[in-house]
Amino acid sequence: MAAASSSDSDSGRAESNEANSKWLDAHYDPMANIHTFSSCLSLADLHGDGEYKLVVGDLGPGGQQPRLKVLKGPTVLTESPLPALPASAATFLMDQHEPRTPALALASGPCVYVYKNLRPYFKFSLPQLPPNPLEQDVWNQAKEDQIDPLTLKEMLEDIREKADVPLSVQSLRFLQLELSEMEAFVNQHKSKVIKRQTVITTMTTLKKNLADEDAASCLVLGTESKELLVLDPEAFTILAKMSLPSVPVFLEVSGQFDVEFRLTAACRNGSIYILRRDSKHPKYCIELSAQPVGLVRVHKVLVVGSTQESLHGFTHKGKKLWTVQMPAAILTMNLLEQRSRGLQAVMAALANGEVRIYRDKALLNVIHAPDAVTSLCFGRYGREDNTLIMTTRGGGLIIKILKRTAVFVEGTGEVGPPLAQTTKLSVPRKTRLYVDQTLREREAGTAMHRTFQTDLYLLRLRAARAYVQALESSLSPMSTTAREPLKLHAVVQGLGPTFKLTLHLQNTSTARPVLGLHVCFLYNKALYALPQAFFKVPLLVPGLSYPLETFVESLSSKGISDMIKVLVLREGQSAPLLSAHINMPVSEGLAAA
């Protein structure tokens, strides 16, 4: 009876959670064998029949060949092998002709494979890069039998370590061979031309000339050679090429190519670069404190996930808006757009199995998955508008549908004021002294204000007089003269009785060196001893800080200290250019003795 009641309570709790959830569980297959990333998922009406299908670039784990899969509902409609691992998948309209059937672009290796009606349509290959001239020369020597394979390997390894241009695939394969296989490889490939090919790291789409949903779009490619390429949607020619300081891994775009657009690229060096139309190099740069793991544009805010388990919000000019800490590491991110309610939010899948949905830094919803989610996609699937598709680390497929009555509310989901507004503040009671002071301020407010203003003016006058006196007597550590613009500061090191005194003297002019200066120390000879109280300063080059070191010996055993004055003098002048007063510390060695 107890077991039966426990089972009934668990089932009742599950039904209650499902009733309170904003999502309907449409499908869950833990053995779907789909291993992919968010960039390799795309939803599109591939046949123009109103039935949206899911395009998956499957990585093919466990030695399996990568494959392109198209799913209709929970079942796989078609499969086709890929020559290399997929980097990204996107659907776009190539032209304005009827019927308006979108094309499918899949980036894999150095190529973009374009499909129409799920049939191969076009293959775009990245242009080849010029090879390393040193590498070309080494292979020419091997072609003429001037060097043996072992020498060839040593020279290629030396080039790989020192050269900025990476080696070709042919040379990299040769360096991986055993000694017995090298000679046959050299004889087979020494007559071939050295080719250096880059690969695609990320891809997205950019509207060509209209912002409409059914307008033609260009493909934007990020490559391993630190470049961004914009392709024409019909001829597949390169319309624009932009350079980046590092390899792009995530891309976000806005605008139209023929009007005005903005490209945002998150790169491997931990920075985010923002480019505008007609700019060959980045206009803005956002430096992150950790590597980015995702980039999503929500309205005009760039949301970045980092390896420090946090989400950051930035403007398009790089200004940081907010930061939200996550309870676990972020695995992947994507955009949630509910067009019927005008909602845009960011989805972040965490390593603890949670999928968190944020609007700015406000938490809207949390989904608990049975396994860590590695890819996310939200949009129209089949004939349902708001469908969430997730794949898990173990290869599972999860499909959820957002309820039509679901409304996302910030925080815990409860409508009303936050709990902090209902908490009473512990305001202290008014004391007799507080009441008397309030009455006094009301009665004598004008006189109190006049007294305050008089004291303030006197303080400003005394400060101005002291400043003028310091300038006239060169008591300041900075020189205000145009001929000798100098800056001085001192550092005392040690516990005593011997201290190390370091003077940092800097010529702050832009192009004029300073010569003929001397340094003089004024001190109490009964308390301190210096090896040299007057010495000449070398030539001061503009912009450099010169450390001038000396040692100070404390002679007093009574635990007292005094001030040492440092004067910077010009030869032939009695007034010092600079001066500094150094308060010496108490000698701990003599005090302890």
From Swiss-Prot:
Q: Which terms in the GO cellular component ontology are assigned?
A: BBSome; centriolar satellite; centrosome; ciliary basal body; ciliary membrane; cilium; cytoplasm; motile cilium
MF annotations from Gene Ontology: patched binding; phosphoprotein binding; RNA polymerase II-specific DNA-binding transcription factor binding; signaling receptor binding; smoothened binding
* Reported consequences of knocking out the gene: Mice are anosmic (inability to perceive odors) and have defective olfactory cilia. Significant reduction in olfactory sensory neurons ciliation in the olfactory epithelium with decreased cilium length and number. Impaired cilium localization of the BBSome complex.
Q: Where in the cell is it found?
A: Cell projection, Cilium membrane; Cytoplasm; Cytoplasm, Cytoskeleton, Microtubule organizing center, Centrosome, Centriolar satellite
Database matches in InterPro entries: BBS1 (IPR028784), BBS1_N (IPR032728), GAE_BBS1 (IPR056419), Quinoprotein_ADH-like_sf (IPR011047)
Q: Which UniProt keywords apply?
A: Acetylation, Cell membrane, Cell projection, Cilium, Cilium biogenesis/degradation, Cytoplasm, Cytoskeleton, Membrane, Olfaction, Protein transport, Sensory transduction, Transport, Vision
Q: Which residues carry this modification: N-acetylalanine?
A: 2
The alphabetized list of GO BP terms reads: adult behavior; brain morphogenesis; cartilage development; cerebral cortex development; cilium assembly; dendrite development; fat cell differentiation; fertilization
Q: What does this protein do?
A: The BBSome complex is thought to function as a coat complex required for sorting of specific membrane proteins to the primary cilia. The BBSome complex is required for ciliogenesis but is dispensable for centriolar satellite function. This ciliogenic function is mediated in part by the Rab8 GDP/GTP exchange factor, which localizes to the basal body and contacts the BBSome. Rab8(GTP) enters the primary cilium and promotes extension of the ciliary membrane.
Q: Which protein, by its recorded name, is this?
A: BBSome complex member BBS1
The source organism is: Mus musculus (Mouse)
Per UniProt, what is the name of the gene that codes for the protein in this document?
Bbs1
